């Protein structure tokens, strides 16, 4: 048992448990069951508090990927696991600051949200018996009791379970795993029987009256009484043959558990078909910026003024012509739309006072591009319910697409460093409590690694475009407003810089519901010749609009400048999430933090500094056909950030489905790598669920191809 405890629990927990036992003069080598029980209890207390924070409004939130600007403090103070003197000091200080009644016994946690101490119990017996013993022992109305059992049951004061379903499920799953691990080593029975009750024991707890009637009413079918059901449950040992257990539970279930071996999994089948095309709302690696440094012009910061100033930095405009038509669109209209933008910007400059916003004339080309008057007329259901052949349109299945090489190039580009900084140091939220100097140190190191990353540029560009579009959609519902696509950054020398990527013209936007769509036409500058990868640009009409002089090693060269024009659409809810893209920074920071935590618990000290400053060490970044790719810690930060940003840019139902379903297969494969001898049933069904999400989405197809590389290397 002692070996099992040392293997199964985090070294920090084991050390705390040993300390606690020594404090009471007990020997972990002799009282091994108690050793295991203390470790389990400690782990449950820590899991209880994990990820739970309080934001600046005093609301409780769960942060696994939260808002980077939130001022967060931990929701729970952990008292369990501190030495007695320290623990009482913490309790006293909480009582002094909050005015809560001082408990007689040391509780396990304090909840800053509900302002109460919590006693956590983990029992190998029945939860309500253990609950009563606890309640009798502490005899305090004020301390909240929450009991978990190894069978997945729980009981809490006034049925108030404090935490959300998912957090409690994590704890129950962990307890169940510990139980299974013990059972598989033949340690469970002695552990289960070794539990002694609390000091004040009330013998057999009788349920009477209303509670008894409710208990009898709520039994599963085929059980005559509560005793009868209890006896059945007590005899239900989880280890052993699952098929038998399933058939015991239901006549309809006949699952054959198949062992999952190295040879079992096959690669995911990626769809065949023409290569997939770019579907992001704005250009990524192909974008070109017209920039002004140290902007100080009149009206600086007003998007339209900034845009006109940026446009004036370029002198190579020429008569536009179409170099790659859109397959299905009326291409001359796209050409006319760009000419109209140029003409109307020229008109603005000829006015005495430049307006703050510009509404475009409703020309026929813009009406066509923005789908004006194209929506079918809505008819009240009452007026047509008698129509005999009323039916929904038949919609075509989406056409399957194959993975194209451009998707991996886009991702690689997103991980690279640019020569500008896109976020300030405090972009990922501020310090809240003094304890958080470690957190702020981590945040600063992390920010330094990602502030120049191209993925960070995409975040700021996404936040700007979505904010501007949502704003215009509400403020100018009927107008075709011209919205410049702008971002701001700092150069290496710390000079401010304003960049213009192109323009958006928004259509009518009477957005009543979150999912109502606003159409827009985007026009974006680029130096990429669309004829090199025409499949990537099938949704675009591309014009050649000028020649740009570029400084290169061999002197100045002239390159054609292109304009990528397309019609697109978005909704209130998508724009709302687009404005929240900074969350990607926090999500990737937290992934890095969990790597640091793992390292710190092995070394038993905070490893933040070493982690970021030891430049020689390499870390696994991902799997490619060549094997496991490794890189510096900065590269890991940027890769995690790029993944998070692409999940936001390419969010789709296909991605949701693929992530959820492939995760199940991933867990099975990891269990196999950890020699846990996993078994599965209906593996074919799981593959089907994963593969029905592989249709045509570029980001999902790339993830599926990475998944296949992972399978290959994981099963070698």
From Swiss-Prot:
Post-translational modification: Phosphorylated on serines and threonines by host kinases, including human casein kinase II.
Species: Influenza A virus (strain A/Gull/Maryland/704/1977 H13N6)
Quaternary structure and partners: Influenza RNA polymerase is composed of three subunits: PB1, PB2 and PA. Interacts (via C-terminus) with PB1 (via N-terminus).
Source species, domain of life: Viruses
Swiss-Prot/TrEMBL GO biological process terms: cap snatching; DNA-templated transcription; symbiont-mediated suppression of host gene expression; symbiont-mediated suppression of host mRNA transcription via inhibition of RNA polymerase II activity; viral RNA genome replication; viral translational frameshifting
Single GO molecular function: endonuclease activity
The protein's required cofactors: Mn(2+)
Residues that coordinate or bind Mn(2+) 1: 41, 108, 119-120
InterPro entries: INFV_PA, PA/PA-X, PA/PA-X_sf
Keywords: Cap snatching, Endonuclease, Eukaryotic host gene expression shutoff by virus, Eukaryotic host transcription shutoff by virus, Host cytoplasm, Host gene expression shutoff by virus, Host nucleus, Host-virus interaction, Hydrolase, Inhibition of host RNA polymerase II by virus, Manganese, Metal-binding, Nuclease, Phosphoprotein
Motif Nuclear localization signal 1 (NLS1) location, chain numbering: 124-139
GO cellular component, one term: host cell nucleus
Cofactor, how bound (note): Binds 2 manganese ions per subunit.
Subcellular location: Host cytoplasm; Host nucleus
Full protein name: Polymerase acidic protein
Family: Belongs to the influenza viruses PA family.
Binding residues annotated for Mn(2+) 2, in chain numbering: 80, 108
Documented EC number(s): 3.1.-.-
Protein purpose: Plays an essential role in viral RNA transcription and replication by forming the heterotrimeric polymerase complex together with PB1 and PB2 subunits. The complex transcribes viral mRNAs by using a unique mechanism called cap-snatching. It consists in the hijacking and cleavage of host capped pre-mRNAs. These short capped RNAs are then used as primers for viral mRNAs. The PB2 subunit is responsible for the binding of the 5' cap of cellular pre-mRNAs which are subsequently cleaved after 10-13 nucleotides by the PA subunit that carries the endonuclease activity.
Annotated motif Nuclear localization signal 2 (NLS2), positions: 184-247
């Amino acid at each position: 048992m002692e070996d099992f405890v040392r293997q199964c629990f985090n070294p920090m927990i084991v050390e705390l448990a040993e300390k606690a036992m020594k404090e009471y003069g007990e020997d972990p080598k002799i009282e091994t069951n108690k050793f295991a029980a203390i470790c389990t209890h400690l782990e449950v207390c820590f899991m209880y508090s994990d990820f739970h924070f309080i934001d600046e409004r005093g609301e409780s939130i769960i942060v696994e990927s939260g808002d980077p600007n939130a001022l967060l403090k931990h929701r729970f103070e952990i008292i369990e696991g501190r030495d007695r003197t320290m623990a009482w000091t913490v309790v006293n200080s909480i009582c002094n600051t909050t005015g809560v009644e001082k408990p007689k016994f040391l509780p396990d946690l304090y909840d800053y949200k509900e302002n109460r101490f919590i006693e956590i119990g983990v029992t190998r017996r029945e939860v309500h018996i253990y609950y009563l013993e606890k309640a009798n022992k502490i005899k305090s109305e004020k301390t909240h009791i929450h009991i978990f059992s190894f069978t997945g049951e729980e009981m809490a004061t006034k049925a108030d379970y404090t935490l959300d379903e998912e957090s409690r499920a994590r704890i129950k799953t962990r307890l169940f795993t510990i139980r299974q691990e013990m059972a598989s080593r033949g340690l469970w029975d002695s552990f289960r029987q070794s539990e002694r009750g609390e000091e004040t024991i009330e013998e057999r707890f009788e349920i009477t009256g209303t509670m008894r009637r409710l208990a009898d009413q709520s039994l599963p079918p085929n059980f005559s009484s509560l005793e009868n059901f209890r006896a059945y449950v007590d005899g239900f040992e989880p280890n052993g043959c699952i098929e038998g257990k399933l058939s015991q539970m239901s006549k309809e279930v006949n699952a054959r558990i198949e062992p999952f071996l190295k040879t079992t999994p096959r690669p995911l089948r990626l769809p065949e078909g023409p290569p997939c095309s770019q579907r992001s709302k704005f250009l990524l690696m192909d974008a070109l910026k017209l920039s002004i440094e140290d902007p100080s012009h009149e009206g600086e910061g007003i998007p339209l003024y900034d845009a006109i100033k940026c446009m004036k930095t370029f002198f190579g405009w020429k008569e536009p012509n179409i170099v790659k038509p859109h397959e299905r669109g009326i291409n001359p209209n796209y050409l006319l739309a760009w000419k109209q933008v140029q003409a109307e910007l020229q008109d603005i400059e000829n006015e005495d006072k430049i307006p703050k916003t510009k509404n475009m004339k409703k020309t026929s080309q813009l009406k066509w591009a923005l789908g004006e008057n194209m929506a079918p007329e809505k008819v009240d259901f009452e007026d047509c319910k008698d129509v005999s052949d009323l039916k929904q349109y038949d919609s075509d299945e989406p056409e399957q697409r194959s993975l194209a090489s451009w998707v991996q190039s886009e991702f690689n580009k997103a991980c690279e460093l640019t020569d500008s900084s896109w976020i300030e140091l405090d972009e990922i939220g501020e310090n809240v409590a003094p304890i958080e100097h470690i957190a702020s140190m981590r945040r600063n190191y992390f920010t330094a690694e990602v502030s120049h990353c191209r993925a960070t540029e995409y975040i700021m560009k996404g936040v700007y475009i979505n904010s501007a579009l949502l704003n215009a959609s509400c403020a100018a519902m009927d107008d075709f407003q011209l919205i410049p696509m702008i971002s701001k950054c700092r150069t290496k020398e710390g000079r401010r810089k304003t960049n213009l990527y192109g323009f958006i013209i928004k259509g009518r936007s009477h957005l009543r519901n979150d999912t109502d769509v606003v159409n827009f036409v985007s026009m974006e500058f680029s130096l990429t010749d669309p004829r090199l990868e025409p499949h990537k640009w099938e949704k675009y009409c591309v014009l050649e609009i000028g020649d740009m002089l570029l400084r290169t090693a061999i002197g100045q060269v002239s390159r054609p400048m292109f304009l990528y024009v397309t019609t697109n659409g978005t909704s209130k809810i998508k724009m709302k999430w687009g404005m929240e893209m900074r969350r990607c920074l926090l999500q990737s920071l937290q992934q890095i933090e969990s790597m640091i935590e793992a390292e710190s618990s092995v070394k038993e000290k905070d490893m933040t500094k070493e982690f970021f400053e030891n430049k020689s060490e390499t870390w696994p970044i991902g799997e490619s056909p060549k094997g496991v790719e490794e890189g510096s810690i900065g590269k890991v930060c940027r890769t995690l950030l790029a993944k998070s940003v692409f999940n936001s840019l390419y969010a789709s139902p296909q991605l949701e489905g693929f992530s959820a379903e492939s995760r199940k297969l991933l867990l099975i494969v990891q269990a196999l790598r950890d020699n846990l001898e996993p078994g599965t049933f209906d593996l074919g069904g799981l593959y089907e669920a994963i593969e029905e999400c592989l249709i045509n989405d570029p980001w999902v197809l790339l993830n599926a191809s990475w998944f296949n590389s992972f399978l290959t290397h994981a099963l070698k």
